[in-house]
Swiss-Prot record:
Keywords: Cleavage on pair of basic residues, Disulfide bond, Secreted, Signal, Toxin. Belongs to the teretoxin M (TM) superfamily. One of its GO terms (cellular component) is extracellular region. It is found in: Secreted. It comes from the Eukaryota. The cysteine framework is VI/VII (C-C-CC-C-C). This is Teretoxin Tsu6.5.
Amino acid sequence: MAINGRLLCLCLVLGLVFESLGHPSVQEKRAAEDSKPSGERRQTLTTKHEVDCGGIPCQFGCCENDKCRELDCEHYPGIP
């Protein structure tokens, strides 16, 4: 009976040691992401790209012939 108790304690200790050496679990990763301030998270989610198009700033689009195009931009503005 005493041997069973000792083996159980040994297994529990080894489990804790190996758990602390391992990679972070999914729950730990989510907790780290949730700990970011909401302003940082919001800023990364709402990244805007503004292009000056005839004096009017275009967001999320390209400037072609001084008119803003929101979709199907053939090239990325700023890259030759």
